[in-house]
C-alpha cells in the first residue's frame, strides 16, 4: 500500500513523549534503579552545594521509592517565560532545570534537567512535596501528565525546607519492576562517602531493614574499610585533592601486593561512572608518569625495561571523585565520562602529587617501584613466548593488514576499518606499537546461516580469521594475536549495517572471542562542533543538541560539521575520537550465559533469509522505536 509522504506524515514528539517512546535512550531499562539514582542525585546535588545535610530514602512495600532531603526545596514560583510553576516545568519538560548554568550549582550531575523528567515519564505516579518559605506544597503526576495542580497543603517553620519525591515506576518499561536493593545500597553508601558530613539513611520496608551512613573522612575511610585485613602498600591510602575554578579532583588509592578483591570506583559530580572514562584514564596516566620519573631519577629501572600503564595499575585499588562543570557523558545513563579535557587535568594533578609523595616516602616508593618493575619484566617474558604467525608459520598474513610491533595481549588491538580511505587515515593515526589496522572493502557476507566449513570461502572472512589467528567455531584462543578486536565503521546507517554484519560474524562463528570479552565496537562521532579554540564531538543528534545548548551561554557562534564517514576525518581527528584510549568510545560486545538462546533467536529473526515475514511483523510492532535517517 503506497502512502503519500508529505508534511502531514512528519510527527513531532512533544513533552515527555520521546522518553516513553524510546526509554532506552534515556535510562537503563533493566530495573528502575537508575530512576531512583536520578532522584537521589538531585538531593545529593543540594548537599554538594552546601544546602542539605540529610537525605532519606525509603523503599516502600509496593516497590515505590521516596527520596526526602532538607535542601532549599524545588522552586514553586511561576516561571516568567512559561507561565507555570517551576516545579511543574522541571517534572514535565526535558532539558528544564537550574543546573545548565553555574549560577545555582558550581558542580552538579546536570540533573533537574533530563533526569527528573525522565522519572516522571516512566512512572505510573509521581508525588512531589516541597517545604519552602514556611509553606508545604504538593503536586502530582500520572504517566508523565499532571493530575493535580500545585497547591498549598500545610505550613512549616521558615527554616524547615526541603523536597520529597515519591514515585511508582511503570513496570511496562522495565525488564524487572523490582529495585535491586544491593545496588541501591551501594549507591547510597558511595554518596555518603563523597559528601563528608552528610547523613544518608535507607529504609527498606520490604525486608524491614534500616541503614545509616555518615563519613567524616570520606574517601580515606571508605577505601580503608574495603581492604580491611589485606596487606596493603602503603599502609595508609595515598590521598589527595585539588580544586580549580571549573574542576576539582579527590582520590584515595593503595596497592594490594599479595592480591585480593580490588575496589575500583570513580565518580563525576557524585554520579557513579561504572565504565570509567577520561578521569580514570587521567588517574592511570598520572600515576604512570610519576613512577617513570621516580625510577629514572633514582636510576632503578633495569636496561631494556619500560613501564607501561598496566604495570602500575594492575593491583591498584582506588576511589576517584571528580567535580566539573558541564561534564560530557557517553550516553544518557552517565556510566562513562567522555570529557576530553578531564584526562589532562586529572593526569597533571595526580602526577605532581604522586611524585611529591614518592620522594617523601622513599621506602614505600621503592617497594612500589619494585612491584611495577617485576610486573613489567613478567609482561615482557610472556610477550616473548607468544609466537606470531609469520610467512613461514601458518597462512600468510593479509597484505592489507598493518600489524603492530607489541605482542602483549593485554595491550594489542586490531581495528577492522570500513573502507580503504578510512583505513589509510587510521594507519597514520594509530600507535604502531600496539594498534593494528585492517581495512575492509564494503559490506561483508551475511554469515549467519553459513556453515563454519564454508564461511572461509569469503575472502574478507578468511582474512579476518588469519589476522586474528583463530579458526571459525574454535574454542582454542591460544593463538589469538590481539587482546581487543575493534569494529570501526561509519556512524551512518550503512556503517551500522556493516557493524551489524561483523557482530553477527563474531557471535556466530567466533563466539569464544565474544564470551571472553575480546570483541568491541568503536563509536565514531557523527558531528564536530567548534567554538573558538574549543572542539566538541557528538555521537548522536541528541548529544549535538545538548552541546549546542551548553554553548549558548558562551560568546561566539558554534560551527557544526557532520561527518559523512570516517574517511572525512584527518588522522589527528581519527586518533582523538576513535583510537586514543584516553578519549575514544568503545562498547564491548557481550553475551550473558543466560541470554544465549534469546540472543540467537533475535539474531536469527533479524538475519535469516527465510524470516522476512517475521522481520516485517517485528518492524510493524517496534518500528516507532527506530532512529531513521531521511
UniProtKB/Swiss-Prot annotation:
The answer to whether the entry has keyword Transcription regulation is no
Question: Per the record, what are the reactions this protein catalyses?
Answer: ATP-dependent breakage, passage and rejoining of double-stranded DNA
Q: What does this protein do?
A: Topoisomerase IV is essential for chromosome segregation; it is the principal protein responsible for decatenating newly replicated chromosomes. It relaxes supercoiled DNA. MukB stimulates the relaxation activity of topoisomerase IV and also has a modest effect on decatenation.
The answer to whether UniProt assigns keyword Magnesium to this entry is: yes
Q: Which residues bind ATP?
A: 5, 42, 69, 110-116, 334
Q: Which family does it belong to?
A: Belongs to the type II topoisomerase family. ParE type 1 subfamily.
List UniProt keywords, sorted A-Z.
Antibiotic resistance, ATP-binding, DNA-binding, Isomerase, Magnesium, Metal-binding, Nucleotide-binding, Topoisomerase
PANTHER family given in the database record: DNA GYRASE/TOPOISOMERASE SUBUNIT B (PTHR45866), DNA TOPOISOMERASE 4 SUBUNIT B (PTHR45866:SF4)
The chain positions of domain Toprim read 412-525
Which residues bear the site annotation Interaction with DNA? 443, 446, 497, 615
Q: Which gene encodes it?
A: parE
Notes on activation and inhibition = Pyrrolopyrimidines inhibit both GyrB and its paralog in topoisomerase IV (parE).
Pfam families (alphabetical): DNA_gyraseB, DNA_gyraseB_C, HATPase_c, Toprim
Name the chain's protein.
DNA topoisomerase 4 subunit B
Task: Give one GO biological process term.
Answer: chromosome organization
Origin organism is Escherichia coli (strain K12)
**Outcome of residue 445 to H?**
In strain: DH161; quinolone-resistant
Q: Which residues bind Mg(2+) 1?
A: 418, 490
Amino acid at each position: 500500500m503506497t502512502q503519500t509522504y508529505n508534511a502531514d506524515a512528519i510527527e513531532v514528539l512533544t513533552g515527555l513523549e520521546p522518553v516513553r517512546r524510546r526509554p532506552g535512550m534515556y535510562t537503563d531499562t533493566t530495573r528502575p534503579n537508575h530512576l531512583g539514582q536520578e532522584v537521589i542525585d538531585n538531593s545529593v546535588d543540594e548537599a554538594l552545594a552546601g544546602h542539605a545535610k540529610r537525605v532519606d530514602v525509603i523503599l516502600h512495600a509496593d516497590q515505590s521509592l521516596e527520596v526526602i532531603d532538607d535542601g532549599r526545596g524545588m522552586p514553586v514560583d511561576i516561571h516568567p517565560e512559561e507561565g507555570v510553576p517551576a516545579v511543574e516545568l522541571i517534572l514535565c519538560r526535558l532539558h528544564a532545570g537550574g543546573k545548565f548554568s553555574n549560577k545555582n550549582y558550581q558542580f552538579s550531575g546536570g540533573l533537574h534537567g533530563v533526569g527528573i523528567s525522565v522519572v516522571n515519564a516512566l512512572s505510573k505516579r509521581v508525588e512531589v512535596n516541597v517545604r519552602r518559605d514556611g509553606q508545604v506544597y504538593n503536586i502530582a503526576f500520572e504517566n508523565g501528565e499532571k493530575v493535580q495542580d500545585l497547591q498549598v497543603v500545610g505550613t512549616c517553620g521558615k527554616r524547615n525546607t526541603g523536597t520529597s519525591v515519591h514515585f511508582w515506576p511503570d513496570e511496562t518499561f522495565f525488564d524487572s519492576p523490582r529495585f535491586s536493593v544491593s545496588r541501591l545500597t551501594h549507591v547510597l553508601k558511595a554518596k555518603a562517602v563523597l559528601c563528608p558530613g552528610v547523613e544518608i539513611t535507607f529504609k527498606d520496608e520490604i525486608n524491614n531493614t534500616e541503614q545509616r551512613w555518615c563519613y567524616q573522612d570520606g574517601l580515606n575511610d571508605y577505601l580503608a574499610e574495603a581492604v580491611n585485613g589485606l596487606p596493603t602498600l602503603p599502609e595508609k591510602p595515598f590521598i589527595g585533592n585539588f580544586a580549580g575554578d571549573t574542576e576539582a579532583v579527590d582520590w584515595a588509592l593503595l596497592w594490594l601486593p599479595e592480591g585480593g578483591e580490588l575496589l575500583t570506583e570513580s565518580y563525576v559530580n557524585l554520579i557513579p561512572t561504572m565504565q570509567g572514562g577520561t578521569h580514570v584514564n587521567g588517574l592511570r596516566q598520572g600515576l604512570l608518569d610519576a613512577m617513570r620519573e621516580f625510577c629514572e631519577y633514582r636510576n632503578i629501572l633495569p636496561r631494556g625495561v619500560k613501564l607501561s600503564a598496566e604495570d602500575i595499575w594492575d593491583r591498584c585499588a582506588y576511589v576517584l571523585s571528580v567535580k566539573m562543570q558541564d561534564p560530557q557523558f557517553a550516553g544518557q545513563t552517565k556510566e562513562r565520562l567522555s570529557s576530553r579535557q578531564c584526562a589532562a587535568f586529572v593526569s597533571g594533578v595526580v602526577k605532581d602529587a604522586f611524585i611529591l609523595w614518592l620522594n617523601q616516602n622513599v621506602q614505600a616508593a621503592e617497594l612500589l617501584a619494585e612491584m611495577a618493575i617485576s610486573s613489567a619484566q613478567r609482561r615482557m617474558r610472556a610477550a616473548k613466548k607468544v609466537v606470531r604467525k609469520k610467512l613461514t608459520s601458518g597462512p600468510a598474513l593479509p597484505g592489507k593488514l598493518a600489524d603492530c610491533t607489541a605482542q602483549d595481549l593485554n595491550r594489542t588491538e586490531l581495528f577492522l576499518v570500513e573502507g580503504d580511505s578510512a583505513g589509510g587515515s587510521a594507519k597514520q593515526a594509530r600507535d604502531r606499537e600496539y594498534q593494528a589496522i585492517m581495512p575492509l572493502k564494503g559490506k561483508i557476507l551475511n554469515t549467519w546461516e553459513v556453515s563454519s566449513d564454508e564461511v572461509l570461502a569469503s575472502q574478507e572472512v578468511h582474512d579476518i580469521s588469519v589476522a586474528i589467528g583463530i579458526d571459525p567455531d574454535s574454542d582454542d584462543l591460544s593463538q589469538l594475536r590481539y587482546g581487543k578486536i575493534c569494529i570501526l565503521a561509519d556512524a551512518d546507517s550503512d556503517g551500522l549495517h556493516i557493524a551489524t554484519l561483523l557482530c553477527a560474524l563474531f557471535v556466530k562463528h567466533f563466539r569464544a572471542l565474544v564470551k571472553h570479552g575480546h570483541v568491541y565496537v568503536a563509536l565514531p562521532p557523527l558531528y564536530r562542533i567548534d567554538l573558538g579554540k574549543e572542539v566538541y564531538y557528538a555521537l548522536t543528534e541528541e548529544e549535538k543538541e545538548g552541546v549546542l545548548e551548553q554553548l549558548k551561554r558562551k560568546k561566539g557562534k558554534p560551527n557544526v560539521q557532520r561527518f559523512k564517514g570516517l574517511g572525512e576525518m584527518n588522522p589527528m581527528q581519527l586518533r582523538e575520537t576513535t583510537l586514543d584510549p584516553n578519549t575514544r568510545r568503545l562498547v564491548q560486545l557481550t553475551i550473558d550465559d543466560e541470554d544465549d538462546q534469546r540472543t540467537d533467536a533475535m539474531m536469527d529473526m533479524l538475519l535469516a533469509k527465510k524470516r522476512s515475514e517475521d522481520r516485517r511483523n517485528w518492524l510493524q510492532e517496534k518500528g516507532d522505536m527506530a532512529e531513521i535517517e531521511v
